[in-house]
Each structure stands twice: as structure tokens, then as C-alpha cells.
Regions:
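Conserved acidic segment of CheY-like receiver
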Residues: 1-12, 16-20, 33, 48, ...
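Active-site residues of response regulator receiver
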Residues: 51, 79
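Receiver (REC) domain active-site loop signature in two-component systems and cognate sites
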Residues: 54
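C-terminal output helix
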Residues: 83, 102-112, 160
Length: 196
């Protein structure tokens, strides 16, 4: 899990990063929302500690851009200048927590650990759903799906299993419907989710 810290007050952000690292957590600092939006890999699970008041792009605007991009990890806002409107907007957009600067280290650690626990629980739920869908396939469909995800073409799968290519196509099509995937890339992502 990766904790992203976005704050234009670099000494403050570095101090938070050091605190998190000292607790055995992975953390990275971005000095601006723009740099964060350019550099971050949203596929890496974790959370975001986001300063509200930054030049150019504030925390609420950053959160909105993240939502537009499909961001799904918890956002913990930090601000020295919280007001009711800002807090309401942040929480309506799905903020996990709002902390007032300066924040006590134990309060920050508790908020981060709580947000990471939410991520773990969500990932476990997703994993259970994926495994349940996979278990709903027939044995033959499971064989074909695994071979297809490994990159084998229908004819190669047919040769390996001693069945016709048409039979492979029928089982593969049925499996795609059951797993709610539409293409090989989605199938491979599904299998990765199941194996994680």
C-alpha cells in the first residue's frame, strides 16, 4: 500500500512522510496537485493525504479530477483553514477524513491506518467476488479461461485440450459472459485480481 502526500508546504509534507516511513508504511510526497496527477499510478492501492489550500489546483478541485479519472482510494484532507462549505463538499465527493493542521502524529497515523484498512477490506471483498464468479464456471470453462489469459489462441487451446476450436470458442464466450469481461485484456485483469 502506498500513501501519497500532496502538499505544497514541502517541509511539512516531508515531516509527514518521515513519520509514516518510521511506522513502516510506504509513502511518497508530491509538492503540487499537478505533479501528483501527472506522476501517480492509480492502480497502486493506498490512500491520499491531500492539502486543501494549494496554489493553482486546490484539494477539492484535485479530488474532483481524481473522481473523474476513476480514483477509488480514500482521501484524507488536511487543512489549516477548514470551513463548513469546504468540509461538506469534500465529504460529498467521498473524502474519508478531514484533519486540521497542525495535526498530532497519533491522530494522523490513526486516520491513515483506518483508511488503509478500508482499502484492505474493499480489496478482500473484490477478491471474494472475483473468486466466486470464477468458481461459477464449469471445469472446462476454467481451463479455457486460464489458457486464454496466458496468451494462447483458440486453436492452441483446442490442440492442448483435444477439443475443437469451435468448442473452445463456445466455452470461452460463455465464460466471458459469466465473468462479465469483453476482451482478452479484461480477462487477464480478472485473472490477476483473482490471483492477488
Amino acid at each position: 500500500m502506498l500513501i501519497r502526500i500532496v502538499d505544497d508546504d514541502e517541509p511539512f509534507a516531508d515531516a509527514i512522510c518521515f513519520l509514516l516511513l518510521s511506522k513502516g508504511l510506504r509513502a511518497v510526497v508530491h509538492a503540487s496537485a499537478e505533479k501528483f496527477l501527472e506522476e501517480d499510478d492509480p492502480s497502486v492501492p493506498g490512500c491520499l493525504i491531500l492539502d486543501y489550500q494549494m496554489p493553482e489546483l486546490n484539494g477539492i478541485e484535485t479530488q474532483r479530477k481524481l473522481l473523474d479519472k476513476g480514483w477509488r482510494w480514500p482521501v484524507v484532507f488536511m487543512t489549516a483553514h477548514a470551513d463548513v462549505d469546504m468540509a461538506v463538499t469534500a465529504f460529498k465527493q467521498g473524502a474519508f477524513d478531514l484533519l486540521r493542521k497542525p495535526v498530532a502524529p497519533d491522530v494522523l497515523i490513526a486516520a491513515v491506518e483506518s483508511s488503509l484498512e478500508k482499502v484492505r477490506a474493499g480489496m478482500q471483498h473484490h477478491h471474494d467476488e472475483v473468486c466466486g464468479l470464477f468458481e461459477g464456471l464449469t471445469n472446462r470453462e476454467r481451463q479455457i479461461v486460464k489458457l486464454a489469459a496466458a496468451g494462447l489462441a483458440n486453436q492452441q487451446i483446442a490442440d492442448r485440450l483435444g477439443i475443437s476450436e469451435r468448442t473452445v470458442e463456445a466455452h470461452r464466450s460463455a465464460a466471458y459472459r459469466c465473468l462479465n469481461v469483453k476482451c482478452l485484456e479484461e480477462l487477464q485483469a480478472f485473472i490477476r485480481d483473482m490471483d492477488d
